[in-house]
Amino acid sequence: MPKKPKISRSVAAKKKLKDHLKTHIGKSKKSSYYFTPTEAVAWYWWRVINKAAFKNKLPYPSEIVIRKLRGAWGLCNAKSRADNCVITISSEITNRKLFIATVAHEMVHQWQWYDKRSLDHATSFREWNVYFKRNFGIVL
């Protein structure tokens, strides 16, 4: 019996993310199901996106918090250069695709923090937006 070809973890994670978005979020009726964000689900998608988009190079944030936010779907905060980022996601998100896109959005800010120590929507953020849209159909 021939052996299965080995697939790298990041390729498998990309496929997992694409398949999930296509199956559960695309044009299917399942996308209209009510979704409740939890920290466990946020951590799950953080790990999947880290493998798929960042090749597992993004260090873990110090925490991911789900709480009510005013005027934003998510935040990525770091108080000092030595701190890991804290990612906060709005508890009011009821759409799975928006939730995954928000986690990805805040992960790009986390990457910006570790790479350049800035959290903005300038050139590097726009490049990541193109990457996520092209590869996963997610608009950050």
Feature roles, as predicted:
Residues M1-A101, Q110-L140:
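Active-site-proximal or metal-binding-adjacent scaffold patches in catalytic folds
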Residues E106:
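Walker B catalytic acidic pair
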